[in-house]
Amino acid sequence: MAINQAHVHPHYTLPGVMHYLQTEFTKNERDRITWELERSEMKARIAELEGENRDLKHQLNQIQSKAVSPEGEKEEKHVPDSLLQSKLAVQENVKEIIYLLKGPNTVNQLESLNSREAGSELHDLEKLNVNTPKEEGSAKTNGMDILNNALLDTKPNPKQGPSESPSPTKVKSLFSTANKRENNETISKIHSELSKVDIISSYGDCMALYDADTKSLEIHQVDANLNSKLLKKISLGQDSDIMKFFWVSTSKLLVIEKSFHLKLFSISSASLISDVDLLQDSEQPFSSSDIINIDFKNKWLLIASKNKSQIRIWELDNIEAPEDVPINIKETYEITHDNDDDDSNDSTNILDCILGITEKSLILLSSNPYQLTIYDFEGKLLQKIDLKIDTILSGKPEEEGYHLFLDRKTSKLLIQLSNERLLVYSFDKKKVVLKEQLTPSSTLPIQLDLNDSIITVSYSNGDFEFRNLENLKPSIDEFVVADINFSERKEPVVFSSNLIVDSTPVLITVNKNNEVLLHKIKI
């Protein structure tokens, strides 16, 4: 006789099913994040190897050049420049990978898995127990460790320059500081042979001074005691009319003229290396009066124009070569910014445009409404960021006072709006993290400069103040330039804060007697 056996059915409950699904989801997410981290580690390792490869190529080029050159001893001075170039290139790659590691594919997912608050720091990976060495003795390395070691190994030496034997100059106090500091070692005066100084630019411990009347350029090197030595004086030619110039290395300068000729000068020989017409193949030429900004990074040159809201980027070939070889244009990109997404008939204005935080990208600040737009070099829209400006700004969009400053080390963007408002946008947190209102009153115009997370604020009456990018709060190192009177001047103050001496940023400005003033910035 058959015995009826009772069938046992599984008993499911809603909490049990939810627990099972959550467990499986967490497991899958951990596996996926582990794969993302491994991929990021590989990117970091690739960047490190590419940097080593680039370094070896530079050294090989130098050895080959010295072998065929009858003046081998003179060629040796280019070796530090080539090494510095490769180190800076590796550092840029590493910074970009750090930014990618902080992106939504990895760190934001870690945040959601660990149920963290939105404003917390996003760098703790230990809670998931991923990417750690195995008990069997695996030698797997954490990706951030690779990046940190690479940054330490590739940190450029600010003291490195064309010469190591500066000559002393006369030093005396030229600043009356707000806190009445008596340390005169942080202040220096340098005599220049130029009749006046119109442009100041710096690179490491070297600075370039330009006189637009005589078309002359002076290159100085500054030591830890703020003593200066004149390294070279270069005549750019009477037909030269400079809009902007950039340092390529301690031995080369890139000059952009109003005729849109791009000239590369050798500092060591004080000679012209190459002259390229940027618009030789262009059907729509630029006008220098329409130029909003010119930016340069690595081998990319960007020029933004108000005319039809156009941006052009040139890829320069041979620009990173350690030898004095002519440059040429490898490729040109054209991007037209429009406001087609808006239903209104109001036109959008480009206020500023700079090269982006990642390779082949740019960041654009526009009005109506005030927003950031990120494009790639093919013109593809990557992101739009509404700045949510809900108050009326005093300055008009077509006026000066709208600028972007990118700090790649912290992945933050400093935004200046109409001489009166500062914003800080974080690419890590994908939002505006700081806002600060300036009170310029009668001291317009205001100029900004950003160097190593230190914001230099210049007022047209000769006042300078310094703020930290982390909180936008002014430091105690405020001062007024003595022997100077800008009360009746309306043009901007000529200054630069990118000079680095003994790992310390230095402010450079000029007084009414055409004396170049140096001031060590204390934060």
From Swiss-Prot:
The modification Phosphoserine is found at S115. The keyword Thylakoid does not apply. It is found in: Cytoplasm; Endoplasmic reticulum. GO terms for cellular component: cytosol; endoplasmic reticulum; endoplasmic reticulum membrane; FAR/SIN/STRIPAK complex. It comes from the Eukaryota. Pfam families: Striatin (PF08232). Residues 160-171 have a biased composition (Polar residues). Present with 4010 molecules/cell in log phase SD medium. This is Factor arrest protein 8.
